[in-house]
Amino acid sequence: MCFIGIGHAQERKIAIVLHAGAGYMRPDMYTKDQVQDYTDKLSEARDVGYKILENDGTSEDATVATIKILENSTLFNAGKGCVLSHNKRAEMDASIMNGSDKNAGAVAGVQRVKNPITAAQAVLHNSPHVMLSGSGADDFAEAQELEMVAPSYFVTDERMEQIKKMIQEEKNKTDLFRDAPESLSDNKFGTVGVVAIDKQGNICAATSTGGMMNKKNNRIGDSPVIGAGTYADNRSCGVSCTGHGEYFIRLAVAHEVSALMLHRGWDLEKATNYVVHKELMDIGGAGGLIAIDRKGNISMSFNTPGMFRAARSSSGENSVAIFSE
């Protein structure tokens, strides 16, 4: 009689990857101190999530904790310091999905919940719906006893100056969505996202954003749309996207990566690169994505000059980067 693996079950690989936006970022646009600030915050967020995984926490707990750190930082386009819509207000979107049961939750256009990702998580667990929007989503978050703030909490002086400048250029008949100067165009490509796989092999993906600077009031991008900006399936992968959301919606980018793996048998790297560098670019879409497959392999693919990103896994990967390298 042969007993195999009794008491020696192989521990699954754990991994976490995050992005904080893809866009027209070049080294000459940032001081050394600014680069250090970004890399420090990305590393901090990554390590908080990884520690949760390391201590037997779930991938869902890891993704939410990581995104909250990014939402609470004014460095990124999510939560406090996010970009502003045409009405000079923060209208934020977020979503989360578990690959184990494909349950998901999302909110769009929230203005009062301090951490939009927690509202999306509350929808996942405590609502029969997948997505809530606007004041109804804020009211739901408040009823769930999540931390609420005044809309002014999210507005920084820097973002207010940016929106005023863009509105003035709009009045001067500048086509902001096609001909914006590069100094401003990176504001269109915010978003933060996290994908993680825990010791149980469960994948979770989550995304949070302020959307597009000077967007029309109540515009909704890909971030809260399950299958477009966020997707997770334990059979294939978890994906979180960043970029010009309209293109990601049209291609259902996050789900497309999973579908290529499931139905064509492609590996993660081939699927992500094909979607980002072929399918997206064929229709003029700019941006990127992060992904983790069921084996814990990580992909960070983007077709812009840069993407704020970081990753860590139990197989030794430990990285943080901003620019194309």
Residue ranges and their predicted role:
Residues 1-11:
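Bacterial Sec-dependent N-terminal signal peptides
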Residues 10-325:
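Alpha/propeptide regions of enzymes that mature by internal proteolysis
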